[in-house]
From Swiss-Prot:
Belongs to the GINS3/PSF3 family. This is DNA replication complex GINS protein PSF3. One of its GO terms (biological process) is mitotic DNA replication initiation. The gene is PSF3. GO terms for cellular component: GINS complex. It is found in: Nucleus. The GINS complex plays an essential role in the initiation of DNA replication. Component of the GINS complex which is a heterotetramer of SLD5, PSF1, PSF2 and PSF3. Transmembrane segments: none annotated. Pfam families: PSF3_N, Sld5. Keywords: DNA replication, Nucleus.
Amino acid sequence: MTTDYYDLDDILADSEKLTCKFNITVPGLGYLEGNPGKPIHEDTKLELPHWLSGILATVAIDEDSNINFLDLADPDIIKEKVINAIKTDPLAVDLHKLTPYYYSLILKWGNLYTDKTLIANVMNCLKARSLEIYNFSNNANKTLNNEFLYTLDEFERALFKSTSDSNKSMRKWLKTK
């Protein structure tokens, strides 16, 4: 799961909006909140796409300052309630409902803020869910009307499709032997 300039899933993940708060008044950016030509004032809260908010959250106002243009609020996908649900039963969490690009956003968030506990919890979630995805891809009858498959984010859906296709190819190859 790498970032790719031409990957549509990566573009869609980058367009997910994050809540942020401006640390300074910025002249001329009022159009971001529907006020063209006006400034965005300090402490203004907005939802901006990840591609923009990520840059503004990591760039200092000037080289002598430790203050960034804005601070990002923790998105819902990493709030304690979601992480506790993932720790308790990763198979029961509807990642697609949280965001269709859950793992991509976690990866992008992890690049901004190093949080080893978050990464470990999400990796455990992916491991548990990958095993279940593999089990479903091996048994075509099991996939009919199964709620778990509707909870997969886009990365997991691609994993399911790839695994299913590989299993079909393997069965086809074994029949020729």
